[in-house]
Swiss-Prot record:
It is found in: Spore core. Belongs to the SspP family. Its main location: other. Induction: Expressed only in the forespore compartment of sporulating cells. Residues 26-44 have a biased composition (Basic residues). Residues 1-44 are annotated as: Disordered. This is Small, acid-soluble spore protein P. The keyword Lipid metabolism does not apply. GO terms for biological process: asexual sporulation; sporulation resulting in formation of a cellular spore. Residues 8-18 have a biased composition (Basic and acidic residues). Signal peptide: none annotated. It comes from Bacillus cereus (strain ATCC 10987 / NRS 248). The keyword Ubl conjugation does not apply.
Length: 44
């Protein structure tokens, strides 16, 4: 599922070329969320 989303995002970015900051922001947010969840679990 993640691979498909990444491919779609990449295609959209290459096609539009403008939604670069949007894609970056989304990626960072997603990564941050995953990291935070992991950290919380570790903390527990």
């Amino acid at each position: 599922m993640s691979q498909t989303m990444s491919k779609n995002n990449r295609e959209a970015k290459e096609k539009k070329g403008q939604p670069e900051p949007l894609s970056g922001s989304h990626k960072v947010k997603n990564r941050n969320h995953s990291r935070q969840k992991h950290h919380a679990h570790h903390d527990m």
